Amino acid sequence: DGTEHYYEFHTKKGMLLVTTDGKKNNGKVTHISMMYNDANGPTYQAVKNYVGKAVTHTEYSKVAGNFGYIEKGKTTYQFASAPKDKNIKLYRIDLEK
């Protein structure tokens, strides 16, 4: 029916968000996101090496902190770290249908 519904599942490590399209409880999954409480997953470089050729971007800021982004197909990985830590780590994964 074109209506989006969101389902949140909270875990010790973070939140899993499932987006569906269609009637409530009978829709098709269109998007899944996992947002971790802490950016302590794999490093940006490790995921980049694993994924291979992809759209990538990094920014380093002494004030706002550091950020990285990898997009391969319909999968997106986001990374972050504190301003003094140049080793950015995974904190979010998005999968799209």
Predicted features along the sequence, with ranges:
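A cross-family detector of function-defining hotspots
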Residues: 1-25, 38-97
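Acidic/histidine-rich, surface-exposed loop or edge segments in extracytoplasmic proteins
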Residues: 25-33
